[in-house]
Amino acid sequence: MYSPRLLISLAALLVLAGCAGQRSSEPAPRAPAEVKAEIVRLMPAKVPDRQGWATDIYAAFAAQNISPTTQNLCSVLAVAEQESTFQVDPTVPGLGKIARDEIDRRAGKAHIPGMLVSAALAVRSPTGKTYSERLNAARSEKDLSAVFDDFIGMVPMGRTLFGGFNPVHTAGPMQVSIEFAEQHARDYPYPVSGTIRHEVFTRRGGMYFGIAHLLGYPVSYREPLYRFADFN
């Protein structure tokens, strides 16, 4: 659940984007080009490839039959700005250490000696690098998720520590839950060559599932801040 401080930040973003006071009343249907142009206008000018973002955002609205009202667009853009500043795969400082600390914590809970953990992480992974090297080089959740996918799938200790479940739980520009995406993938409009987890790390997938989580259900209230509070 969002904290009061974060809700205030999201409210401020709505004001800065010129979205304050917008209501979600159903407008007359608009041409795709008109909606995309509005998305580009509402996005911060510094964001690279705003046209590409607009295309993926519009496609997510259209595929889910969600009305692209100005309020709905503003709500989506506010969350993407707050969560990732419109980065498809945002970097996380100190991520490798965080991951190693979690591995050590789980190993301690399972009474696995540290030297065995270090030995398991010294095994070469499918990329040719050791798991320890890949952990140290990880800069984003996508990097870390790939490490854990391989570690859990190929090293027995990985399965012992994580039970087959990748501990990276969120992804994408809106930081949507991967579990949510996997549970709502039935109508996903794009071809999936790998897994839904991998799709959430793409711009199109991250925005599709993020928009589904934020707007893909009916509510009785009108203010977008209440949707922000529901988005977790």
Would you name each region that the model predicts?
Residues 1-5, 14-232:
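Cell-wall glycan-active module
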Residues 8:
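N-terminal basic, Ser/Thr-rich segments that initiate or prime the first beta/alpha elements at protein or domain
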Residues 11:
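Flanking scaffold residues of small Cys/His-coordinated metal-binding clusters
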